[in-house]
């Protein structure tokens, strides 16, 4: 049930990506429509530290179950609302739920496993999270082709997972239940920053790419399928991650993300756009579990919920900031050129990060 819960996290905001062009026609195409997707990420970023505190003090399982129920209710509510402000409100509540799910899942895995097994299962966590995108995004694209509101019903899956969590989850270790004061590991701040920047770049896929693909002649079903391509290779990256030397994985993964994004912007072929997404998604699949593992090693058991929640906050703050940071570029140079410039900068940054690690070691 823990890994099943992970499938609901990354796709939570992106599942309405195929609906964005139709939503733009209903509400007016602009930043606010894109925020219907990313305001969920802001709510996750804000709520994650609180969720970490709750996980450390009250337990991982109660937080997970309550968050799953809230996820199902707030997610499906989007089908029924008729105004953009109310829709943004339901998406905000959804974000609170995802913050609790991600934090409790990461804390449970790091409580249950040590050493190589921990790295392996953190890779599984990222793989299952990405797998949720592979399964749900194409389905959302098909549903959006019928009615842009239908994808909101996919959030109801969380109700089934909640029942399984209630019945199937074992008690967590006692060390995880009793939080004690301690110094916060300052090295975690740099990890949070890397996660924010990488995710800000990666989230151009669901927020900007649907409009680029529409201009290339793609419909909602194709948009959902193509965007899901990035999550497909994220699964591969996360599964390969435990078998690679960990030192330079983060820098190499970020460089791959940048290379993929540069390819997206440099072509007018949907096939090559898909290839760029596959490369970038593989890079992200390497980065996230490695950052998770480093944080788990830094944090004592009683503080894991809080320390790991900072990574959740960094990831989803990057998602929220993505359309805002890219917005000035799009009218100035166009969506395609925005991908090129972002990709070049990201590739250089990842290479510097990887080479810098090599020099220190």
Where are each of the predicted segments found?
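Helix-breaking motifs and short loop linkers at transmembrane-helix boundaries and internal kinks
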Residues: 28, 59, 80-86, 114, ...
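Conserved MFS/SLC helix-loop-helix module at the cytosolic interface between two early adjacent transmembrane helices
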Residues: 46-83
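Helix-to-loop junctions at the C-terminal end of transmembrane segments
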Residues: 48-59, 236-247, 330
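Structural signature of the two symmetry-related core transmembrane helices
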Residues: 62-76, 248-263
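Paired small-residue
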Residues: 70, 74, 85-94, 271-279
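Cytoplasmic helix-loop-helix junction between adjacent transmembrane helices
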Residues: 90-129
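Helix-loop-helix hairpin linking two adjacent transmembrane segments in secondary transporters
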Residues: 115-120, 124-168
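A late C-terminal transmembrane helix in Major Facilitator Superfamily
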Residues: 298-335, 342
């Amino acid at each position: 049930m823990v890994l099943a819960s992970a499938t609901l996290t990354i796709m939570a905001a992106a599942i309405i990506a195929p609906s964005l062009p139709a939503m733009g026609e209903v509400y007016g195409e602009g930043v606010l429509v894109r925020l219907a997707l990313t305001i969920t990420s802001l709510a996750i970023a804000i709520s994650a530290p609180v969720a970490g505190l709750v996980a450390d003090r009250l337990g991982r399982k109660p937080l997970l179950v309550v968050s799953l129920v809230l996820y199902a209710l707030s997610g499906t509510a989007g089908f029924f609302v008729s105004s953009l402000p109310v829709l943004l409100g339901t998406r905000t509540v959804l974000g609170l739920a995802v913050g609790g799910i991600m934090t409790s899942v990461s804390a449970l895995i790091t409580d249950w496993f040590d050493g190589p097994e921990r790295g392996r299962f953190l890779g599984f966590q990222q793989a299952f999270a990405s797998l949720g995108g592979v399964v749900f995004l194409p389905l959302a694209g098909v549903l959006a082709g019928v009615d842009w509101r239908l994808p909101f019903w996919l959030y109801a899956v969380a109700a089934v997972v909640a029942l399984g969590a209630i019945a199937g989850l074992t008690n967590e270790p006692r060390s995880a239940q009793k939080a004690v004061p301690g110094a916060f590991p300052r090295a975690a701040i740099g990890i949070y920053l890397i996660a924010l920047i990488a995710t800000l770049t990666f989230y151009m896929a669901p927020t900007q790419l649907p409009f680029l693909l529409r201009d290339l002649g793609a419909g909602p079903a194709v948009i959902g399928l193509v965007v899901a391509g990035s999550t497909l290779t994220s699964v591969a990256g996360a599964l390969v991650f435990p078998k690679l030397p960990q030192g330079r994985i983060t820098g190499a993964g970020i460089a791959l993300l940048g290379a993929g994004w540069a390819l997206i912007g440099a072509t007018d072929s949907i096939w090559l756009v898909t290839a760029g997404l596959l490369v970038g998604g593989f890079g992200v699949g390497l980065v996230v579990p490695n950052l998770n593992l480093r944080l788990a090693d830094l944090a004592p058991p009683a503080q894991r919920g809080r320390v790991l929640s900072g990574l959740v906050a960094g990831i989803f703050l990057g998602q929220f900031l993505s359309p805002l940071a890219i917005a000035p570029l799009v009218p100035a140079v166009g969506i395609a050129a925005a991908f090129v410039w972002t990709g070049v900068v990201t590739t250089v940054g990842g290479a510097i990060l990887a080479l810098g690690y090599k020099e220190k070691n």
